[in-house]
Amino acid sequence: MGSTISPPSGEYLLEMRGINKSFPGVKALDNVNLNVRPHSIHALMGENGAGKSTLLKCLFGIYQKDSGSIVFQGKEVDFHSAKEALENGISMVHQELNLVLQRSVMDNMWLGRYPTKGMFVDQDKMYQDTKAIFDELDIDIDPRARVGTLSVSQMQMIEIAKAFSYNAKIVIMDEPTSSLTEKEVNHLFTIIRKLKERGCGIVYISHKMEEIFQLCDEITILRDGQWIATQPLEGLDMDKIIAMMVGRSLNQRFPDKENKPGDVILEVRHLTSLRQPSIRDVSFDLHKGEILGIAGLVGAKRTDIVETLFGIREKSSGTITLHGKKINNHTANEAINHGFALVTEERRSTGIYAYLDIGFNSLISNIRNYKNKVGLLDNSRMKSDTQWVIDSMRVKTPGHRTQIGSLSGGNQQKVIIGRWLLTQPEILMLDEPTRGIDVGAKFEIYQLIAELAKKGKGIIIISSEMPELLGITDRILVMSNGLVSGIVDTKTTTQNEILRLASLHL
């Protein structure tokens, strides 16, 4: 299915041809191709569940393909482990970094293959070899530093340098910028381009369309386990890529705004967190049926606002007024009782219990309310409410007993939102609600948010994606270094104005 630009044989570093893989009852990959040239950055895109992960697991030998061939540097290969693939020159930098935090940078670089001098590890050689690679890639990190003291972006650099130390010809990067600042992203892109100049083929996986156009030369698109197209980025636009990914044209990235903000339901005045550095003197109003965005650069303390409102952080001063009555949320339970709900930023670590089912994950925030008169859990009500979450949030799942970790990121997020709606909140706060979610699922999340606002919920959204804030909010509160630097009307503001305000107190 689809079309490709096919150069003469031998121009590819990696050729995955006609890869098929089935699981019981599921055709995961159906005749999928991926061809990567040297000196190129190749985007691999598709919605969650399109087959990207399965294809790469077949490449690394984690899954054995049913049929098809893998040709690397002109030779057919069939790896049986990621270690074997790495030793042959194919490396992957995972979204979840794979480093030993308690060990030094150079220990992590050469783990399992330390240079030796006699019976001992040659520390000097390990240091010099690490420093030489870092110098070549313009990485400014002390090889002796403990990894646990470094930023996420620095850890990314170490993973890339480690791949380089194996003389990797193919480097696969899975959502490498998901936790990076703009400055860190630019540095990462510089290093990726250096790898390209040295002849590497980079496979770049990201849901951030702007990055794809900024960085990549070619793109392969998968949908529902099928190969759709491999084409140069030149001549493509965002709408064409989205249409190929989702199988239909998305005429709009954001739903129409049908909500009509009403009376003020939440008044925040001079809110300051006890633990500093954090928020200071934060004031704003939230109206019934309003979607209020919170923007700011990394470190602006956006998350601190919602954590303080939700009782996770203690306030030292200021007032929170709900429907004209002053309240105090000393704990999350108090906040829930006052009608607040918080969808946290880190879905995997603080949002879901990955190995438990949808039922448990749907009900856990409200579990005490399911006890009957004799103190036992009311299974009938629990099953009914779980089904309500699945139906009303439009969760794609075989059933409520399905392990939530097996769902796509978009469907996991729908379950989390549904879980909080069961607490019947008036104020719904969402921190980076579409991070790591594909473009089709993003639109569905936006639709849910718009529907909730239309029903009168007061909604606060924190997002690092400026187009998202401009596309779905009514107003945007801009934070800078813990202070409110402005509140703007979404209809009349610009991205440049928001960035100017975000830099005001740096």
UniProtKB/Swiss-Prot annotation:
Keywords: ATP-binding, Cell inner membrane, Cell membrane, Membrane, Nucleotide-binding, Repeat, Sugar transport, Translocase, Transport. It catalyses: D-galactose(out) + ATP + H2O = D-galactose(in) + ADP + phosphate + H(+); methyl beta-D-galactoside(out) + ATP + H2O = methyl beta-D-galactoside(in) + ADP + phosphate + H(+). The keyword Transcription regulation does not apply. It is found in: Cell inner membrane. Transmembrane segments: none annotated. It holds the Pfam family ABC_tran. Its EC number is 7.5.2.11. It is a peripheral membrane protein. Stimulated 3-fold by galactose and inhibited by vanadate, N-ethylmaleimide, and 5-methoxyindole-2-carboxylic acid. It comes from the Bacteria. Belongs to the ABC transporter superfamily. Galactose/methyl galactoside importer (TC 3.A.1.2.3) family. The complex is composed of one ATP-binding protein (MglA), two transmembrane proteins (MglC) and a solute-binding protein (MglB). PANTHER family: CARBOHYDRATE TRANSPORT ATP-BINDING PROTEIN MG119-RELATED (PTHR43790), GALACTOSE_METHYL GALACTOSIDE IMPORT ATP-BINDING PROTEIN MGLA (PTHR43790:SF7). This is Galactose/methyl galactoside import ATP-binding protein MglA.
